[in-house]
Amino acid sequence: MKKNDYEKAVELLKEIVQDCKFKEKIYLVGGCVRDLVLGKTPKDIDLCIDYPEGTDLFIDFLKTKPECSGFVTYNRFKTGKFSLDIGTNEKIDIECVVPRIETYNQGPRRPDTVQQTNITEDAFRRDFCCNALYKNLLTGEVLDPTGKGLDDCKNRVLRTPLDPEQTFKDDPLRMLRAIRFACTKMFTISEETYSKIDNIPEYSALSMERIRDEFTKILMSKNAVRGIIELIGKCLMWRISKIFQLNIGFVQNNKYHDKTWGEHSLAVLGHVIQGGANLELRLAALFHDVSKPICYQVKEDGSFSFHGHDKESAKETRKILTNLKYPGEVIDKVVFLVENHMCIKQLYDYSRGLYTGKPCLLYTSELPTILRV
């Protein structure tokens, strides 16, 4: 969200709620407030309505306002959302919720009960203290119910309001979010919180779509290599790729590679990141040799060869990305790059120290795909 759009939206909301009977009980909440405290423009706007049945009443109130549209409520979770027209055909989607507590008995992110509560209890059910901040829409006062959120923003520390073991059990995706925050926002995960990030049983129940979204955010950060290393170190990479999790230290035993397979894969990822690579290139860089640990041949001298690893890696990459529910267009582009990465490599003549167009003759029709990616 652009800074100007955010400011327009907040000012318009202030005007709209002037005749709302619980206007003093409306707060900006979560990542929105965290970003403001950090001096950054929020990416989205979330509201907390600290009033009985606040979500439903607020949505009903907004239905009388021409600037608001697209109303949706989720009664079970006591949440809702709407679109705010800030002018010049610009609309911003805003989510709203009441303070709530949840109980989990049937697995992560499937609360058995959701009950309205007060802001303090709401704050302690959230993922991290830095996200448990509330800014009064009208007065601008910032509430820090955990007593740690403002300090954690200042010191860029990530810790959970409750015992991290319970916080991660309630929603194990928070473990991936912690690693993502460390990569994208340069937060340091507190020692206690970090020690509880692990391959807990609840992690197996997470949907692949949710894992994909966090994995993508990690991969698209400038510190993606660090993020992948953390995922492997905490035994969380297996939901993405078991081969990667189990074989990160695989020795290639080949005169062309002085790095382990894992070191090489991460080095290639780091290289394309420096060039500002998009998602497809980053995925291809990470998985271009993914099948090497399971398709090598032992030569007479004891060294390894990897004939056909490009084709096998392409097959495995398709399985990985399909399992993660990536769009077909993304999968096809990544698989093409992985399958042909040895051919692309041959465009460079190492003996003469220059690029040659000869291999392009074999891939003329596909070359535009490489350039588009």
Residue ranges, per PLM feature:
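Catalytic cores of the polymerase beta-like nucleotidyltransferase superfamily
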Residues: M1-S365, R372-V373
